[in-house]
């Protein structure tokens, strides 16, 4: 990136600086000129303000070029650290960028800061409350994305001239946030995702299919013991033959008032019971 810098009056031609990506090359080019009164920090400040400077090394922040804004004539207050501190940071702008870093606090806005990606750290500079009130009328802060390196615990917001009159006061928040909207649950909940014991639940699909027939029970049926007459008839048929035929099953079902399935299951259980009794007597223990 190239930037033209106008020095003292005896310097006629502008001096061009070419900055490479390496840190050593930038530090070498940022040194003060031999035979002049410009220290290294003033060379950095000149790059931030490409406008003409007075012969004495003091300057004021004039029209700062901002991309996309068609209202010239806005002036910003100079940073006091550029004249008092030898390690002063850049007053405004990242070498011609349209975004300006400002540290935002509850009480007042502190001085402008330079990102550490250019070799310097943030330096604090006091700013009076009157200066902040006048500056707040000229500039409005909007949240955006800056091309500068990210600095933890600092808030970088772009500064653009206010479109309204200087006397008007902007009541917008510095960082607008979307209001919280709770989830919309269509199941009758009260806006929050939680379950309570008293919450009414809709009937499942499998339960709705059984509502028409109230006689159908879910799960295992209740055990109904056989009567003595039924057991006597079953034992008599079992003594005659341990295995039941189809015709015999129908006849026993008609006599005992039991279903054919019940008769078949009883004969199966009776054979298993007899087998257990026989095995128990056969075992020596």
UniProtKB/Swiss-Prot annotation:
Q: Which SUPFAM superfamilies match?
A: Homeodomain-like (SSF46689)
* Primary subcellular site in the record, as a coarse category: nucleus
Q: Where in the cell is it found?
A: Nucleus
Classification via InterPro entries: AP_axis_regulatory_Homeobox, HD, Homeobox_CS, Homeodomain-like_sf, HoxA13_N
**Which keywords does this Swiss-Prot/TrEMBL entry list?**
Developmental protein, DNA-binding, Homeobox, Nucleus, Transcription, Transcription regulation
A Pfam family for this UniProt protein?
Answer: Homeodomain
Question: What's an example GO cellular component term for this entry?
Answer: nucleus
| Similarity comment | Belongs to the Abd-B homeobox family.
The role this protein plays is:
Sequence-specific transcription factor which is part of a developmental regulatory system that provides cells with specific positional identities on the anterior-posterior axis.
Give the protein name, as stated in the record. Homeobox protein Hox-A13b
The major lineage groups are: Eukaryota, Metazoa, Chordata, Craniata, Vertebrata
Gene expressing this chain: hoxa13b
């Amino acid at each position: 990136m190239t930037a033209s810098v106008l020095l003292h009056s005896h310097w006629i031609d502008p001096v061009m600086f070419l900055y490479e990506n390496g840190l050593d090359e930038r530090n070498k080019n940022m040194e003060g000129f031999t035979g002049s009164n410009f220290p290294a920090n003033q060379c950095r400040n000149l790059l931030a303000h490409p406008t003409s400077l007075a012969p004495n090394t003091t300057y004021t922040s004039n029209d700062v070029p901002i991309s996309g804004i068609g209202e010239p004539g806005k002036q910003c207050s100079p940073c006091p650290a550029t004249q008092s501190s030898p390690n002063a940071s850049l007053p405004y702008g990242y070498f011609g960028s349209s975004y300006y870093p400002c540290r935002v606090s509850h009480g007042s806005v502190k001085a402008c800061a330079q990102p550490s990606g250019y070799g310097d750290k943030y330096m604090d500079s006091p700013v009076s409350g009157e200066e902040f009130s006048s500056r707040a009328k000229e500039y409005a802060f909007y949240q955006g994305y800056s091309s500068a390196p990210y600095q933890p615990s600092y808030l970088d917001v772009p500064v653009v001239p206010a479109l309204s009159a200087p006397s008007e006061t902007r009541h917008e928040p510095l960082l607008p946030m979307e209001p919280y909207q709770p989830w919309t649950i269509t199941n009758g909940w009260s806006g929050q995702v939680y379950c309570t014991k008293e919450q009414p639940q809709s009937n499942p699909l499998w339960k709705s299919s059984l509502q028409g027939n109230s006689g159908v029970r879910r799960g295992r049926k209740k055990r109904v013991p056989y009567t003595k007459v039924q057991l006597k008839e079953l034992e008599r048929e079992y003594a005659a033959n341990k295995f039941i035929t189809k015709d015999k099953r129908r006849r026993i079902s008609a006599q005992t008032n039991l279903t054919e399935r019940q008769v078949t299951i009883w004969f199966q259980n009776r054979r298993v019971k007899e087998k257990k009794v026989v095995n128990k007597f056969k075992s020596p223990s």
